[in-house]
């Protein structure tokens, strides 16, 4: 099948490629003029059909021939170009990528968990001028962002919540001074190949060193890291921890966040000292309002946090709440699989909603509001309200989740025994049978008595605070307050007003986070990487030296071969000159056979 040039151009315009044919074209001096004229046309057409060839890819030539080129089928040529160009791109990307230690100065680690470690760091001085102004903390703007949030929630309602934005702390939008770098543990395991050292080989704690009898197998990026990276890149809210950067270095993932000097767990522990009084009412109100504001933002974007607790609620030195640790967070709009299928156990046990304890397969954002209610109660009493003991999962049967009897017991002792009168779908939960078997006694609701007796009966919070707490701790998730409803609760309308700075009015400062420098494995890993790089550089230098020596030897061998060729050429020239001289004097083999030699001047001499 053949195409004319006009029809071929029409096919190009509609995106139809030329039929793939494998042909061999030979170019020589005797080639007809018509074929040589067609080559520019074919080349111009191929430029429109295919990607521009990589100049580093050599032309495909047959060995031992000159001017002969074999063509590749067009789809294969396109595939090879698109694949081979990834190599230079990755190489250029690696050259421009900067390491963690070249950008940040590590001051020590501040927290550790199953996910890995969190380090406090600051930007190096040589990077300050190269960083954009919008890459750091969002900061607190001079405008009343809280009132704007309330206007979005409270469109036509005449009663609006007034937010007190006055503060004595100087706040700006400049680049943050410190960062929190979260290093995830690699999903890997060590496989022993051979062990003949009587158990002498073992991994040293806190690093990734591998001994001679072990091989490190990487199984990929953890699900927690993928969730947190994908969600934090898209979120931008005043009360959500801001992600600054993501660094991939030597199969380790580093997430760089804005740094907060405090968290609620630290504040609660500090206030629980016998010499200190309870947390002031304005501080509690401001903290809870900001938490609800961040949760509202998450839920409006179809995100469940699923791990709200005081340790995951950060507070900046300017009194701004930042919800962090989205490792268990998940989007709940049109999920491909049920929330229970992905994670059978969510939320720390003390803050876990009763529907989760009863084994629900389908839950709603109400699980986050129950956790907020537990946090509010802990801020009021300076201790967890439902401090139960978690039943551990059987290692031999990880698919089954145990019934959390003790945790339910702690909840029932304060909120009373739930019934179908106050919880319509109670008898539809998978663990309802276990619930009826273990809880036969009817407990009354003692939340109001608990509220009056906290802090030795010295509770300065109003009844509106108790109403908010009761609305957040409803058994039935359908009757529980939503984040929007909680933000509009009358508790936030009464005095004292919600402060933009939760620490406004305090005559003391909370201590900063403690920094640990005794186990700084990020530096150890970097040192090992530098040593490996130095070793690689030394090996490369040795290889280069060997190559140079080989090149010198090859060049010397080539010189000797050239000299031998020149000597042979000289001998051949001498023989040619001598034979020409003999022919000029009439010498022939007959005279030589007869024993007569030619002498100069035509004189002959008889031998012997």
UniProtKB/Swiss-Prot annotation:
Domain of life of the organism encoding this protein: Eukaryota
Residue sites binding ATP per the record: 110-118, 182
GO BP terms: cellular response to carbon dioxide; negative regulation of filamentous growth; negative regulation of transcription by RNA polymerase II; nuclear-transcribed mRNA catabolic process, non-stop decay; positive regulation of transcription by RNA polymerase II; protein destabilization; response to host iron concentration
Catalytic EC class: transferase
Signal peptide: none
Compositional bias segments (type: Low complexity): 17-47, 528-583
CC per GO annotation: CKM complex; mediator complex; nucleus
Compositional bias segments (type: Basic residues): 49-59
Keywords associated with the record: Activator, ATP-binding, Kinase, Magnesium, Metal-binding, Nucleotide-binding, Nucleus, Repressor, Serine/threonine-protein kinase, Transcription, Transcription regulation, Transferase
Subunit architecture: Component of the SRB8-11 complex, a regulatory module of the Mediator complex.
Name of the molecule in the record: Serine/threonine-protein kinase SSN3
Organism lineage string: Eukaryota, Fungi, Dikarya, Ascomycota, Saccharomycotina
Gene name per UniProt: SSN3
């Amino acid at each position: 099948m053949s195409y004319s040039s006009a029809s071929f151009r029409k096919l190009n315009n509609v995106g139809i490629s030329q039929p793939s044919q494998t042909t061999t074209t030979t170019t020589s001096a005797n080639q007809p003029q018509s074929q040589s004229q067609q080559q520019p046309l074919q080349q111009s057409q191929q430029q429109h059909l295919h990607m521009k060839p990589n100049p580093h890819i050599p032309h495909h030539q047959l060995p031992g021939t000159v001017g002969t080129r074999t063509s590749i089928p067009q789809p294969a040529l396109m595939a090879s170009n698109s694949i081979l160009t990834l190599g230079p791109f990755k190489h250029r990307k690696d050259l421009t990528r900067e390491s963690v230690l070249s950008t940040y100065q590590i001051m020590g680690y501040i927290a550790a968990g199953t996910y890995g470690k969190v380090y406090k760091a600051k930007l190096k001085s040589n990077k300050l001028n190269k960083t954009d102004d919008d890459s750091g903390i969002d900061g607190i703007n001079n405008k009343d962002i809280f009132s704007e949030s309330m206007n979005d929630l409270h469109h036509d309602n005449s009663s609006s919540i007034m937010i007190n934005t006055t503060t004595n702390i100087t706040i700006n939008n400049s680049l943050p001074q410190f960062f929190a770098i979260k290093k995830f543990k690699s999903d890997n395991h060590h496989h022993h190949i051979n062990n003949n050292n009587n158990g002498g080989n073992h991994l040293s704690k806190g690093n990734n060193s591998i001994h001679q009898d072990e091989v490190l197998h990487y199984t990929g990026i953890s699900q927690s890291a993928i969730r947190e990276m994908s969600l934090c890149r898209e979120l931008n809210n005043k009360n959500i921890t801001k992600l600054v950067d993501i660094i991939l270095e030597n199969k380790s993932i580093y997430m760089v966040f804005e740094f907060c000097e405090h968290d609620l767990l630290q504040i609660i522990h500090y206030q629980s000292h016998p010499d200190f009084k309870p947390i002031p009412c304005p501080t509690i109100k401001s903290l809870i309002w900001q938490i609800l504001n961040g949760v509202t933002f998450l839920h409006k974007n179809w995100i469940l946090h699923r791990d709200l607790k005081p340790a995951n609620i950060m507070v900046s030195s300017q009194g701004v709440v930042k919800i962090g640790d989205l490792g268990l967070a998940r989007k709940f709009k049109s999920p491909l699989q049920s929330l229970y299928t992905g994670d059978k156990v969510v939320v720390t046990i003390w803050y876990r909603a009763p529907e989760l304890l009863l084994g629900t397969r389908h839950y709603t954002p109400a699980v986050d509001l129950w956790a907020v209610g537990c946090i509010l109660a802990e801020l009021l009493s300076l201790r967890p309200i439902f401090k139960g003991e978690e039943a551990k999962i059987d290692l031999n049967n990880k698919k089954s989740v145990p019934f959390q009897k003790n945790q339910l017991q702690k909840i029932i002792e304060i909120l009373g025994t739930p019934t179908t009168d106050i919880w319509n779908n109670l008898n539809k939960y998978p663990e309802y049978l276990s619930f009826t078997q273990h809880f036969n006694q009817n407990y009354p609701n003692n939340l109001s008595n608990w509220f009056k007796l906290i802090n030795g009966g010295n509770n300065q919070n109003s009844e509106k605070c108790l109403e908010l707490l009761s609305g957040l701790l409803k058994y039935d998730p359908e009757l529980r307050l939503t984040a929007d409803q909680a933000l509009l609760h009358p508790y936030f309308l009464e005095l004292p007003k919600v402060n933009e700075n939760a620490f406004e009015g305090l005559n003391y400062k909370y201590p900063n986070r403690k920094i640990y420098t005794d186990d700084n494995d990020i530096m150890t890993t970097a040192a090992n990487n530098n040593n490996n790089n130095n070793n690689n550089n030394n090996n490369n230098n040795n290889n280069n030296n060997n190559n140079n020596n080989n090149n010198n030897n090859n060049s010397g061998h080539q010189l000797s071969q050239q000299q031998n060729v020149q000597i042979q050429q000289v001998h051949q020239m001498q023989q040619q000159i001598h034979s020409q001289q003999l022919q000029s004097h009439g010498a022939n083999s007959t005279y030589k056979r007869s024993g007569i030699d030619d002498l100069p001047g035509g004189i002959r001499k008889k031998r012997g």
